[in-house]
Structures are given as structure tokens and as C-alpha cells.
């Protein structure tokens, strides 16, 4: 009885009944719903045409139909050699049914599988987090200058090396045929041995030189302003409205905890990241700068120093919030994929085709690999907490991950050293800005406000004179700013938080192109752009490498121009154009002429570093 009901619900069986009925009236004797049910593999066995007395008349019709189906099956067996391929396809569809939702999911996994394995070795997975790494390493100046000076400095070493080589030479038996010149050359520097020296003394001399210049400048200012430093414009800029600035900065920081709240809701199961969480975080990020920017630029009458500080710090907070949100959002997607694929494998293991099993198994393997990429003790989603986000915000890094390399303890002497470096560098920056930069800036503003009546030739000459006057002071200020932020400040924060990776910058002063400079002069920002802009645009927007590179530079140029707007409250576009001009400089440095002359390339690069920022500042102040 049950088997008969199953046959009456089988669409293919009813089709066979219609086609094999001898009488036209019987071809439509059985009625059934038009709803297409999922096909299942049903074994049809011949049944007796004898009708049971207890069954209704429809059972007799069913028995006749079963016999007809059996006869049709026998015919199919005889034709197996002719249409065997079609029959195998039909049997495969019956044996391994795939619903449309599952088919869409498998297609999605197939498209993603290309980016999840190495191109040369398909057995190795590629993690989304493999583009950025953190390792215990010191900062460049510490490893090359500070640490050797404090631990191994013992005065001049070159003379001692020469004396040692001469003593070694005297102990050897000289060849009779050796000339005096050959002997002298061998004594000075024997083959295979290199004379070594260090420049620790020059490092000390440079800072001493800067200190005496600052001291002399302060004395001159003290005498010329009748014994007071309170009237210094730079001091007033940096010390006004400190309490209001601190409260506003704290409000910006606390507002970024919104991303933690969103992931907390996802963790509790109230919302899903894929739609609700993603949209909520994206809207928050899109509104963060447009809402806060007018507050500290227009509502409060802050100085340009305060405006640029709040803007840059708000951008840092935005990057940290974005990295935290989308790192965990990606792991939510991976976790959901693992659960879905493993459930399908366990539930429909016997009815899935080998190809489907392979796709789902690879999906599970990759998800486990991704979740355990940083540590086998998977902490996700336990890392979603206010304390974890707070510690991430304290670390001198912009790319979030669950674990970072840490030091065993805090070296308080090192903290004091870096704190003194911060204070001393800020003092030098204030003196440089007040003595060397402020007078030139005032003349540039006067040039901007005064119309030129003598023609464009005198105007160009005066502008060039202002530029040449701007270059020395601004170059010194540029170097001091770099040292204060990327070496002194970040190392001090890293030591206080026991953050072990101190690679905040590379040896950018040895660059031979601006392409190298953009990668290594600001490593934290480069890592953020690499993961969350460059690679994310290739994955989400399907950009090519060239398109992703152009998009990254355009986004960076836009934020640089907004920074200039925070200072001058006007859109000029000079810095935006100079940022894009790096493509031309890169193309120039990649020419055969400069590639074969790295020394000349470094000279061209250094010339650009010295003149470029000064030219940009002069343009904004004068035009």
C-alpha cells in the first residue's frame, strides 16, 4: 500500500502510465498535483496484477501501471548499449540530487577556491591574514645606533684593527718576490678581511649640534622679546584649550566602541554579520569623519595644530575600528561556512556526489586552517570584548589580529629614554617652527594677500625666493617630526604595552624610488592599506593589481588632501596632485638609465624629499 502511494506521487511513473496506456480514456485516469516534488531514487519491482479484496479499485489500476513500468524498465535494459550515457546522467541526478540553494552555495565555494590555494601548489592554503606578519624585532635606529652605542661602544675601533693587522703581518713570513707596494696593501687590508667602524659619535654630534642651535635660537628670541617665551605663537597653538581637546578626543575614541557592540550582538545571536552587522558598521564608518570633522574644524575655534591633530587621530581611530570590525566579520563568515559545510557533509554524506563531497571537505579544511592560522587555541569569538578592543587601540599598530608578539616585561629605563626623546624633539620642533618657519610663513601669507602689479616675472622670482627660504627649516622640521612620531613615540607606547614588533619604518633614506618610499617610510599605515584597501578591493570589487594600486593611491591622496583642508579650510588640491605625481616619479626611476645608477636615483629621491614638502607648503600659503 505504501509503495503504491509512492508510485502515485512519482511524476516519471505517471508519465509512463500515460504513454503506455492502450485506451485514450485511461491515459488521464489518474489525477495528481502539479507541484514538482523532489525526486528520489525508487526501486520498482514487478507486482502481481491480482487485486486484493480489501483494497479499493485504484489499487488494481496501480498494479497494472506497475506492470507497465516493469515492462518499460525491461525495454530500457535492452537499449542500454545505445543510450548508456543518457541513462547514467539520469541515474546520477536521481542518486545525487542537489537543490538550487545547495547548487548556488557550491558555485560560490568553487569561485572562492581559486584564491584559497597557492597557484603553484594547490595542496597549500593561502590565508587572508598571510599578507601582514608581526615578529619580535627592534626598531631600525635602536638596532643600528642606540643599542650598539650603549652596549658595545669603546671608542675608535679602526686604528685598533689596523694595528692588529700589522702585528699579524709582521708574524708572517713574507715572500721574497713580493714588492713593497704589495706588502703595504696587504698590511692595510688583506684580502677577505674588511675593516669595520661605526658612526655612533656622529649620531651624538648631530643631536648635540641640534641642541646648541636650539639653545642659541632660544637665547636670541629671549633677548629680542624682552625676556619671555609665553608670546611664542607656536607655544600658544600647542597649549590652548587642552581640556576641551582631551574631552573631544575621548568622545571620538569611545564612539568607536560601536563596532564592538555590533559584534557583541552577532555573538549573542541577535543579528547576523553578513547583512545587518556589515551594513551597520559600514554606515558608522561612512559617517564618522563627516560628522566629527565639522565639530573640531568649524564649531570649535581651534588652532590649525589642534585641527590637524584631531583629524589625524580620528583617522587612526577609524582605521583601528575598521580593522577590528572586518577582521572579526571575516571570521564570522568563515565560522558560518564551516558549520554549513560540515552539517551538509554529515547529514547527506551517502547521497552526495564525490565532487560535492570534495568541495565541501575542502571548504571545511580551509575554514579550520583559517580559524587556527594565528594560534591552534582558537580564541574566536571570545576575543570580542571591550577589553580586547581597548588593548588593540593601545598597541602602536593599525591592523587587528587576535595575538601579537609580546615582550616579557617593561624596561622602564627605556621608557624614560624615549619619553625624554619625545619632549626634547617637541622642544626642537617648536623652536624650529617659531624661529625658522613662522617668519617665512607670515611672508608667504603676505604674498598671498598682496596683489602683484609688477608682472609675473617679479612674482615668480619672489615666490622662488620664499620657496628657497622655506626648504631648510621645513626639511629639519620634517625629519624631527618623523623621528618624534615613528621612533620615539611609537617605541615608548610599544614598550609600555609590551608590543614586541618595533618595525615601524624601514631605511627609507636609502630609497631609489618613491614606490619604495611609500612602502617603508610608514609601515603601520602601509600594512593597513595592503590588507584592507589593496587586497580587499581585489577580493570584494574584483580589481586587478593595477586597478587596486590606483585605488589605494587615490584613497590615500584624498585623505592627505582632507588633512590640508583641516589646516587651511580651503580645497586647493596641491597635495592631491603631488601624491599622484608619485606614479611619474616611479616611472622615471624604473627607466634603464636610473636603474643602472642607484646612487643617482637616491640623489633624485633625496632632492624630492627635501623640496617636495616645502614646495607643497609654499603653494598652500601663497596661491
UniProtKB/Swiss-Prot annotation:
EC code(s) of this entry: 2.3.1.-
Domain of life: Eukaryota
Top-level enzyme category: transferase
Keyword Transmembrane listed: yes
Main subcellular localisation: endoplasmic reticulum
A Pfam family reported for this protein in Swiss-Prot or TrEMBL: MBOAT
InterPro entries in the record: MBOAT_fam, Oat_ACAT_DAG_ARE
Topology of this chain in the membrane: Multi-pass membrane protein
Family to which the UniProt record says this protein belongs: Belongs to the membrane-bound acyltransferase family. Sterol o-acyltransferase subfamily.
Name this polypeptide is given: Sterol O-acyltransferase 1
Biological source species: Saccharomyces uvarum (strain ATCC 76518 / CBS 7001 / CLIB 283 / NBRC 10550 / MCYC 623 / NCYC 2669 / NRRL Y-11845)
Amino acid at each position: 500500500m505504501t509503495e503504491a502511494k509512492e508510485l502515485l506521487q512519482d511524476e516519471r511513473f505517471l508519465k509512463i502510465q500515460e504513454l503506455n496506456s492502450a485506451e485514450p480514456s485511461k491515459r488521464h485516469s489518474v489525477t495528481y498535483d502539479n507541484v514538482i516534488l523532489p525526486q528520489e531514487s525508487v526501486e520498482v519491482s514487478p507486482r502481481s496484477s491480482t487485486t486484493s479484496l480489501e483494497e479499493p479499485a485504484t489499487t488494481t489500476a496501480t498494479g497494472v501501471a506497475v506492470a507497465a513500468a516493469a515492462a518499460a524498465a525491461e525495454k530500457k535494459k535492452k537499449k542500454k548499449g545505445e543510450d548508456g550515457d543518457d541513462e547514467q546522467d539520469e541515474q546520477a541526478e536521481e542518486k545525487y540530487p542537489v537543490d538550487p540553494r545547495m547548487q548556488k552555495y557550491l558555485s560560490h565555494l568553487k569561485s572562492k577556491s581559486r584564491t584559497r590555494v597557492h597557484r603553484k601548489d594547490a595542496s597549500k592554503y593561502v590565508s587572508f591574514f598571510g599578507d601582514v606578519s608581526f615578529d619580535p624585532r627592534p626598531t631600525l635606529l635602536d638596532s643600528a645606533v642606540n643599542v650598539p652605542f650603549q652596549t658595545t661602544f669603546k671608542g675608535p675601533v679602526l686604528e685598533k684593527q689596523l694595528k692588529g693587522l700589522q702585528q699579524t703581518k709582521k708574524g708572517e713570513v713574507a715572500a721574497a718576490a713580493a714588492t713593497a707596494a704589495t706588502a703595504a696593501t696587504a698590511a692595510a687590508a688583506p684580502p677577505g678581511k674588511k675593516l669595520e667602524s661605526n658612526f655612533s659619535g656622529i649620531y651624538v654630534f648631530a643631536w648635540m649640534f641640534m641642541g646648541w642651535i636650539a639653545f642659541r635660537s632660544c637665547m636670541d628670541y629671549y633677548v629680542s622679546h624682552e625676556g619671555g617665551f609665553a608670546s611664542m605663537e607656536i607655544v600658544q597653538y600647542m597649549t590652548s584649550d587642552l581640556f576641551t581637546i582631551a574631552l573631544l578626543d575621548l568622545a571620538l575614541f569611545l564612539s568607536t566602541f560601536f563596532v564592538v557592540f555590533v559584534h557583541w550582538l552577532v555573538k549573542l545571536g541577535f543579528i547576523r554579520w553578513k547583512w545587518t552587522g556589515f551594513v551597520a558598521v559600514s554606515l558608522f564608518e561612512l559617517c564618522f569623519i563627516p560628522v566629527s570633522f565639522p565639530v573640531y574644524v568649524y564649531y570649535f575655534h581651534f588652532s590649525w595644530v589642534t585641527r590637524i591633530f584631531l583629524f589625524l587621530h580620528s583617522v587612526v581611530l577609524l582605521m583601528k575600528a575598521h580593522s577590528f570590525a572586518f577582521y572579526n566579520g571575516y571570521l564570522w563568515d568563515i565560522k558560518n561556512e564551516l558549520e554549513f559545510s560540515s552539517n551538509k557533509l554529515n547529514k547527506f554524506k551517502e547521497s552526495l556526489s564525490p565532487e560535492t563531497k570534495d568541495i565541501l571537505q575542502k571548504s571545511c579544511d580551509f575554514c579550520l586552517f583559517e580559524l587556527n592560522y594565528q594560534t591552534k587555541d582558537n580564541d574566536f569569538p571570545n576575543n570580542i570584548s571591550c577589553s580586547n578592543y581597548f588593548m588593540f587601540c593601545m598597541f602602536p599598530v593599525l591592523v587587528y589580529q587576535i595575538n601579537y608578539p609580546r615582550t616579557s616585561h617593561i624596561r622602564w629605563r627605556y621608557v624614560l629614554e624615549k619619553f625624554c626623546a619625545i619632549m626634547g624633539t617637541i622642544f626642537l620642533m617648536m623652536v624650529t617652527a617659531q624661529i625658522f618657519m613662522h617668519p617665512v610663513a607670515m611672508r608667504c601669507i603676505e604674498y598671498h594677500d598682496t596683489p602683484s602689479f609688477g608682472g609675473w616675472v617679479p612674482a615668480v622670482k619672489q615666490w622662488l625666493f620664499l620657496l628657497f627660504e622655506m626648504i631648510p627649516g621645513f626639511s629639519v622640521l620634517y625629519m624631527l617630526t618623523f623621528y618624534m612620531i615613528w621612533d620615539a613615540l611609537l617605541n615608548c607606547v610599544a614598550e609600555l604595552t609590551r608590543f614586541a614588533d618595533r618595525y615601524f619604518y624601514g631605511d627609507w633614506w636609502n630609497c631609489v624610488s618613491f614606490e619604495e618610499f611609500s612602502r617603508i617610510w610608514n609601515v603601520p599605515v602601509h600594512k593597513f592599506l595592503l590588507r584592507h584597501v589593496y587586497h580587499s578591493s581585489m577580493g570584494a570589487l574584483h580589481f586587478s593589481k593595477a586597478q587596486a594600486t590606483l585605488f589605494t593611491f587615490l584613497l590615500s591622496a584624498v585623505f592627505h588632501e582632507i588633512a590640508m583642508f583641516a589646516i587651511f579650510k580651503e580645497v586647493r588640491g596641491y597635495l592631491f596632485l603631488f601624491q599622484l605625481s608619485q606614479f611619474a616619479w616611479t616611472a622615471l626611476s624604473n627607466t634603464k638609465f636610473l636603474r643602472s645608477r642607484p646612487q643617482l636615483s637616491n640623489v633624485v629621491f633625496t632632492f624630492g624629499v627635501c623640496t617636495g614638502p616645502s614646495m607643497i607648503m609654499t603653494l598652500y600659503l601663497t596661491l
